[in-house]
Amino acid sequence: MTDKWLDTINWSADGLIPAIAQDKNNGKILMVAWMNREALKRTVESGEAVYWSRSRKKLWHKGEESGHTQKISAIHLDCDEDILLLSVEQKGGIACHTGRQSCFFRQLKNGEWVVTEPVIKDPSQIYTK
């Protein structure tokens, strides 16, 4: 396979594209992260999500420390070619570094952000570094 498919993507000025990870079984949005060309290429090659960490300025294989990897089921590109949707099988049921299933665990209710999702596992038990 050539890399021509990567040229279709409308990358941002800094060479990134947002990637939404969605649970393939129940459709729940798990997280949003960023990918550059190399991250997306490695994701396709490995079959597991690899993102670009904007804060650390390096590739990040999701679950490399926690074991909570994301097995890719499908990758979709939106109509404007500037957002990816990853259909994933979330290993361990935890996508968020807070120990929750989803990074979207707060909901706006009556002008307040309310936590609506429990911690599945304490992050101190997940991340030992």
UniProtKB/Swiss-Prot annotation:
Its cofactor is Mg(2+); Zn(2+). It is an enzyme of class 3 (hydrolase). Mg(2+) binds at D78, D80, D82. GO terms for biological process: L-histidine biosynthetic process. One of its GO terms (cellular component) is cytoplasm. Its EC number is 3.5.4.19. It is found in: Cytoplasm. It catalyses: 1-(5-phospho-beta-D-ribosyl)-5'-AMP + H2O = 1-(5-phospho-beta-D-ribosyl)-5-[(5-phospho-beta-D-ribosylamino)methylideneamino]imidazole-4-carboxamide. Keywords: Amino-acid biosynthesis, Cytoplasm, Histidine biosynthesis, Hydrolase, Magnesium, Metal-binding, Zinc. GO terms for molecular function: magnesium ion binding; phosphoribosyl-AMP cyclohydrolase activity; zinc ion binding. Gene3D superfamilies: Phosphoribosyl-AMP cyclohydrolase. Binds 1 Mg(2+) ion per subunit. Pathway: Amino-acid biosynthesis; L-histidine biosynthesis; L-histidine from 5-phospho-alpha-D-ribose 1-diphosphate: step 3/9. Zn(2+) binds at C79, C96, C103. Homodimer. Catalyzes the hydrolysis of the adenine ring of phosphoribosyl-AMP. HAMAP family: HisI (MF_01021). Belongs to the PRA-CH family. This is Phosphoribosyl-AMP cyclohydrolase. It comes from Nitrosomonas europaea (strain ATCC 19718 / CIP 103999 / KCTC 2705 / NBRC 14298).
